[in-house]
Curated annotation (Swiss-Prot):
<dbReference type="Pfam" id="PF00488">
    <property type="entry name" value="MutS_V"/>
</dbReference>
<dbReference type="InterPro" id="IPR027417">
    <property type="entry name" value="P-loop_NTPase"/>
</dbReference>
<dbReference type="InterPro" id="IPR017261">
    <property type="entry name" value="DNA_mismatch_repair_MutS/MSH"/>
</dbReference>
<dbReference type="Pfam" id="PF01624">
    <property type="entry name" value="MutS_I"/>
</dbReference>
<dbReference type="InterPro" id="IPR007860">
    <property type="entry name" value="DNA_mmatch_repair_MutS_con_dom"/>
</dbReference>
<dbReference type="InterPro" id="IPR045076">
    <property type="entry name" value="MutS"/>
</dbReference>
<keyword id="KW-0067">ATP-binding</keyword>
<protein>
    <recommendedName>
        <fullName>DNA mismatch repair protein MutS</fullName>
    </recommendedName>
</protein>
<dbReference type="Pfam" id="PF05190">
    <property type="entry name" value="MutS_IV"/>
</dbReference>
<dbReference type="InterPro" id="IPR007695">
    <property type="entry name" value="DNA_mismatch_repair_MutS-lik_N"/>
</dbReference>
<dbReference type="GO" id="GO:0140664">
    <property type="term" value="F:ATP-dependent DNA damage sensor activity"/>
</dbReference>
<dbReference type="GO" id="GO:0003684">
    <property type="term" value="F:damaged DNA binding"/>
</dbReference>
<comment type="similarity">
    <text>Belongs to the DNA mismatch repair MutS family.</text>
</comment>
<dbReference type="GO" id="GO:0005829">
    <property type="term" value="C:cytosol"/>
</dbReference>
<dbReference type="InterPro" id="IPR005748">
    <property type="entry name" value="DNA_mismatch_repair_MutS"/>
</dbReference>
<dbReference type="InterPro" id="IPR016151">
    <property type="entry name" value="DNA_mismatch_repair_MutS_N"/>
</dbReference>
<feature type="binding site">
    <location>
        <begin position="726"/>
        <end position="733"/>
    </location>
    <ligand>
        <name>ATP</name>
    </ligand>
</feature>
Length: 910
């Protein structure tokens, strides 16, 4: 009879968000020693002596150690459901004194978290009441039922979700923008005459979740906070921005001026949640103009953002006497923003005293560190999502992402969203990519090591916050054990280590010791639950070994008891079994039930068998349960100690994880370059952009039956503006995007899809490719087009890359031509920005005769009788026709309409 069939009755859910209960400390007022007299002599000292006398050997890796104990489930609340909606629709409508004690406690907690959905654990369900129940039933399509609220109240609205499915439902609430407060059970057996102890164990918000199932594995989950000083007659608007990915510990701060810059930065960050206390002394904070519409704005009190409070919050969190070492006193608004953010994180993570969400020291983001990409450019270039439907497939990230780990995927996404401006840093990345492209065996060996890596960044964070499960710790050990192998492979090949890989050069010895400690303590495949035991190796702890020896003795007694009862009853088919509800029992067939001994007590009757218990068996059952409870509690204590040890090492684990992520991203880029026939661009600080046989990295992959037509480009060395003409649908927009993507790929350190390339660093990439009405803002297509053009003209410099696809087409022909001409002159003359301007205004070809730094190029077509063949080749010279009518015919416009269009064109030309 396996001892693991028994189950602890003293359990708690504390520290386990959605898992099975975890062992609890004994309740106050109750003895921590077993109640069974036979256990009085089983002191810690005697158990340790037993372990020494009967030493246990740890299982070798790969051996089975699968406990079969089942958690004891608390019965669900049994109130009958009602199909009628109760009268009480809001908790504020009731007098708490008239409520039942449980609902009174619920209302008290709800008053502390009015803006959040409060889920209250009752047995196997998380329930909510009043307005939360109504909202939950509507959003999650749950049945709205009711619960008795008291004699004077009657039934109140109630809706609930099963405990085992809570993570899935909470993830859906978070996705819809709700915040959730979880009130969990802190014990399973209340003190006599008292309510079951419950309390808020977690607050889940879109920007602070740590649970794997609520996070996108391959993108950061940013929480942001901003402090704004309004503009005055003498000073512009100034702002400080702090952003943190609570799941990875990454923290960044910056301070700038101008509302446009803030809007652009927030759009690029795409945070899950933005914290802001509003302007002035007004009550509620209205959505400011600099806040992107889709960003989730969470209002906060002003106090956490005050300078004194923010400074104290930072000092407490980082255990510092002064903030001078962080460099934040020079950025007062950023400091205040980070202080408010940190206070919000602390408020939403009710942790144990020895646990905290590990956040890195904030990194200061200086102006000019990254190539600037506004929202329009990121959308037009389809960096991480397609313009049509917002899907990953068809984007640049989809085309080049060959990373093998979640960490590497997030790293590559960050690179695409903020390409480098530092030439040395870019060249360091490119050198590694080049090494891995040419060294195929090295690349394959590294990728074999990377493939099974877990998400060390987020696993370390969960350990530090006290939320990591045993399998999380085993995954951390798996990853840390691979560090020496990665370092060995790289040291034999890399002459110069990029700064981003230095954490892998000489892994900290403490990390190897930590991995060994995890392996020494935990079995290789621990169960998901922390409450059922079966986590810790034999031979780790004398007290635990002594308890296990005692449980082995109980197993032996059960087996012997089964044999004896068979002999006494003369029934060889008798079985001694265990049921998690009824405990241990003797099972006999119906035919033999009448001949059982008189001292047997009938426990349950089934269709084909009868189940009995005996006083001796029941007494032994109590002994087993108490031993099991002590063993599970001891395992949990050992596990928590190990988890705390891992959490204390979160910073070095994450440093190594970021090195792994960088290596994964670089090896993925190398794989893309090697299989795609890409080249290593020659990078410099000039304005030159020379591309030979360049290709669009996404379109080339999507083409199946035809090959991509490559094209050249030479900008910045004599020519600053290219006027690009050609037919509709001939590939002008594709050519423009291809140029921008090659520039961007070069500045993240990647190879590029071309035969060769010389790339001077750009400070910004601007694109104006197509326009749509912004009816919500009251802007027509033409106004949107002009606003985008104005943004380019105000912010472009000689180092910018400007890609324009038609300007002025939304108004009268001569007005549009005039605007396009003036914009072209300004870009080529005053700004000298490197520009490619695709247009159907063929009159702009005349600019090349007036300005030496303007050149004409066209996309070629071939006319074969009535047919038009798009060659997709870009060559010198300006086109004289747009072939719009032919393009309309190819698009399926009815023949009579096409014929009439030709007649009108001839009349206009005459």
């Amino acid at each position: 009879m396996p001892r693991s069939a028994a189950q602890s009755e003293e359990q708690t859910l504390q520290g386990s968000l959605f898992g099975a209960p975890e062992p609890a400390e004994p309740a106050k007022g109750r003895s921590s020693q077993p109640a069974n007299p036979e256990l009085e002599d089983l002191t810690d000292a005697s158990l340790s002596a037993d372990a020494a006398a009967r030493p246990r050997q740890r299982q070798q890796r790969g051996e089975s150690n699968d406990p079969s104990a089942d958690a004891t489930a608390e019965a669900c609340d049994g109130d009958d459901a009602s199909s009628d909606e109760p009268a009480w629709a809001h908790h504020s409508q009731v007098d708490p004194a008239q409520l039942t004690p449980m609902l009174r406690h619920y209302v008290e907690l709800k008053a502390e978290h009015p803006e959040r959905v409060l889920l209250y654990r009752l047995g196997d369900f998380f329930e909510c009441f009043f307005e939360d129940a109504v909202e939950l039933s509507r959003v999650l399509e749950l049945t709205l039922t009711g619960k008795e609220g008291g004699k004077a109240i009657g039934r109140v609205p109630m809706a609930g979700i099963p405990h085992h499915a809570a993570e899935r439902y909470c993830a859906e609430l978070i996705r819809r923008g709700y915040s959730v407060a979880l009130c969990d059970q802190l014990e399973t057996t209340p003190a006599k005459g008292a309510l079951l102890k419950r309390g808020i164990t977690r607050v889940l918000t879109p920007g602070t979740v740590l649970e794997e199932g609520m996070l996108s594995a391959r993108r950061n989950n940013w929480l942001a906070a901003v402090v704004v000083e309004p503009a005055t007659s003498k000073t512009p608007l100034r702002w400080g921005l702090a952003s943190a990915d609570v799941s990875t510990g990454d923290v960044r701060v910056m301070e700038r001026t101008g509302s446009d810059g803030l809007h652009q930065q927030l759009a690029q960050l795409d945070a899950s949640e933005l914290l802001w206390a509003g302007d002035g002394d007004s009550g509620e904070a209205a959505r400011p103009t600099w806040c992107p519409e889709r960003l989730r704005l969470s209002p906060m009190a002003r106090t956490p953002f005050s300078a004194p409070q923010a400074e104290q919050t930072l000092k407490t969190h980082y255990q510092l006497a002064s903030l001078d070492g962080l460099g934040l006193p020079e950025l007062p608004l950023a400091l205040r923003a980070f202080g408010g953010l940190l206070q919000y994180v602390n408020d939403t993570q009710p942790l144990e005293e020895d646990a905290r969400v590990p956040l890195d020291v904030p990194a200061i983001v200086h102006s000019g560190e990254a190539l600037v990409l506004d929202a329009q450019t990121r959308r037009n270039l389809e960096l991480t999502a397609t313009q049509r439907d917002g899907q990953l497939q068809g984007s640049l990230l989809w085309a080049i992402d060959q990373t093998l780990t979640a960490m590497g995927g997030r790293c590559l996404r960050r690179w695409l969203e903020a390409p480098l401006m530092n030439l040395s840093a870019i060249q360091q990345r490119q050198a590694v990519v080049s090494l891995l492209v040419s060294g195929r065996p090295l690349r394959q060996a590294l990728r074999r090591l990377l493939r099974p890596m877990g998400d060390l960044e987020r696993l370390a964070g969960r350990a530090g916050a006290g939320h990591a499960g045993a399998r999380d710790l085993v995954a951390i050990a798996d990853g840390l054990e691979r560090l020496p192998q990665l370092a060995s492979r790289l040291q034999s090949s890399l002459e110069q280590w990029p700064n981003e890989l230095t954490a892998l050069q000489q892994p900290e010895p403490a990390l190897a010791e930590l991995a060994a400690s995890i392996r020494q303590t935990l079995i290789d495949a621990p169960p998901l639950s922390l409450s059922e035991g079966g986590l810790i190796h034999d031979g780790v702890d004398p007290l635990l070994d002594g308890l296990r020896n005692q449980l082995d003795d109980q197993d032996a007694w059960l087996a012997e008891q089964e044999r004896l009862e068979r002999e006494r009853s003369g029934n060889n088919n008798l079985r001694l079994q265990y049921h998690r509800t009824f405990g241990y029992f003797l099972a006999v067939s119906k035919a033999k039930a009448s001949s059982v001994p008189e001292h047997w007590i009938r426990r349950q009757t089934l269709a084909n068998e009868e189940r009995f218990i005996t006083p001796e068996l029941k007494e032994r059952e109590g002994r087993i349960f108490q031993l099991r409870a002590r063993a599970c509690q001891r395992e949990y204590e050992l596990y928590c100690s190990l988890r705390e040890q891992v959490g204390a090492m979160a910073a070095p684990i994450r440093a190594a994880a970021r090195g792994i992520a960088c290596l994964d991203a670089l090896s993925g880029l190398a794989d893309t370059a090697a299989t795609g026939g890409w080249c290593a661009p020659l990078l410099n600080d000039s304005r030159q952009l020379e591309i030979v046989a360049g290709r669009h990295p996404v379109v080339e992959q999507l083409l199946v039956e035809t090959s991509f037509t490559p094209n050249d480009l030479n900008l910045g060395s004599g020519t600053d503006l290219i006027v690009l003409t050609g037919p509709n649908a001939s590939g002008k927009s594709c050519y423009l995007r291809q140029i921008g993507l090659i520039q961007l790929l070069a500045q993240i350190g990647s190879w590029v899809p071309a035969t060769s390339a010389r790339v001077g660093l750009a400070d910004r990439i601007f694109t104006r490719v197509g326009a749509v009405d912004d009816l919500a803002a009251g802007q027509s297509t033409f106004m949107v087009e002009m606003a985008e053009t104005a943004n380019i003209l105000h912010h472009a410099s000689a180092r910018s890359l400007v890609l324009l696809d038609e300007i002025g087409r939304g108004t009268a022909t001569f007005d549009g031509l005039s605007i396009a001409w003036a914009v072209s002159e300004h870009l080529a003359g005053d700004l000298k920005a490197r520009t490619v301007f695709a247009t159907h205004y063929h009159e702009l070809n005349n600019l090349a005769g007036e300005r030496a730094n303007v050149a004409n190029f066209q996309v070629m077509v071939e006319e074969t009788g009535a047919d038009l063949v798009f060659l997709h080749q870009v060559q010198c010279g300006g086109a004289s026709r747009s072939y719009g009518i032919e393009a309309a015919r190819l698009a399926g416009v009815p023949t009579p309409v096409v014929q009439r269009a030709r007649q009108v064109l001839d009349q206009l030309a005459a």
